[in-house]
């Protein structure tokens, strides 16, 4: 490249000299001229495709800054000097590299020697420790086996043994508390006791039996501790507001697996609550509530019904509360008979209040506060007997028996009181009053009966029980009244007696009609009223027929026989007598109200009076029809009968309707 550049710079001078000497018409240089070939080569070169040439020219432009003849002539030398300087610099640099490489080579040689020495020593050590390696391998394998066995043992212990903390929880300390963790540990013991049965079906029966025995002992220890703790907790439940803790409920759930301990704990609870209920009942009777509200029940002893009601209401509330406490205590128990257990314990708890309750109710009943109050107390006792038995069933036998005894006693005294009242009525029977209305004894007795039945209707005793009581009450009260009225009216005339009996029976009927379960008695009273009404109807008809002179005529016609001859020839049945009777009968037809018996005005019921008038009028019309038929009969030999009886039966019926 330097040579070519030098020659290129020298070419123009030579060429120019040759050109001037040869002139314009000179022939071109020969192709075999070396210079020509170089020129052609240079001229034909395509610099854009020659990257090396471009790089050389770029390097040349870095130091060839002045294009002159001198610089062109010295270009070759400059290039060579520059090339030499570069080579010297390169040599100096590589000398440093060579020295570094020689140092590295020495280090590598030293390291190689060290490695060879270490390899030799390792080989020697390997040969010397071969036995140790074999032993180590065996020990590692043994260690692995032991680790596996340790894991198995740990798993076995975790499965079939308790931790020290769990053991401490189960054994605990005397009087120490029982917590949730205790029941978890107890559940763990039960689980182990059940799981260990698997070992008994394998070749590990000895271990299984030992573990089972150990768990059984732990269970007994835990149950004994739990029982002592639960017993202590139950003894502490002596407040009126009993708060059963969740832990105590869990304790009862756990103790159900030991029926004897479970029963003893329930008995302890019942004993504690029994004394609390008795104390609370006595306090309610004598001291009242906190701060004097509510007031002591004994302060209402002057009001027998409220006194008995307050005592029974307190007991009802206490019974319901104790049942709720027991339900909270046994809410987690799943064994059979929980309901029966609750009822039995409630019966034991409430048994303590029976004696003070019985004494106080007996005092009230035996004081004989009156038939109405006795009956109300009897119904009240029956209601609470039904209500409390609905809460606790029939297991609270003592309390329910006490209430039932008091109910029967009050009922007995009540009916005794009614019987005494009835005996007094019969011992001194009053004469009917002048107006033939109900006697004062009857009115007083019916007022008493109305009060009794009203209290019975308002009671909350079950329907079937109320109906049975009603029948007995009505029999005890009404039968003596009916007998008294009959005896009282026995010396009266027929119409007076019938009027008095109708009034008395009507008053009884209106009294009973207001109440339920009286339909049968109302029917009986109605039958008796109708019997006496028939008497009054006949008496009223007879009264009218007698007053108008038709009574004798009608009776004679009814008793007449054909062999006696014609009616016209019989005494007092001739045409003159009949016309006189018809004249009076016409006056009756014009004002029938003027011929009413005085007794009818004494009747209490206007409806009954109208019924008597209506039906007696029908009898009169029927009697007139028979008289009319007999007179119109030709066999009776009446002449011109139309002039004797100028009204037909239909006309008479129309006038009287």
UniProtKB/Swiss-Prot annotation:
InterPro entries: COG6, COG6_C, COG6_N
Organism in which the protein naturally occurs: Mus musculus
The keyword Glycoprotein is assigned to this record: no
Subunit note: Component of the conserved oligomeric Golgi complex which is composed of eight different subunits and is required for normal Golgi morphology and localization.
Disulfide cross-links: none
Superkingdom of the source species: Eukaryota
Subcellular locations according to the entry: Golgi apparatus membrane
Name of the protein in its database record: Conserved oligomeric Golgi complex subunit 6
Homology family: Belongs to the COG6 family.
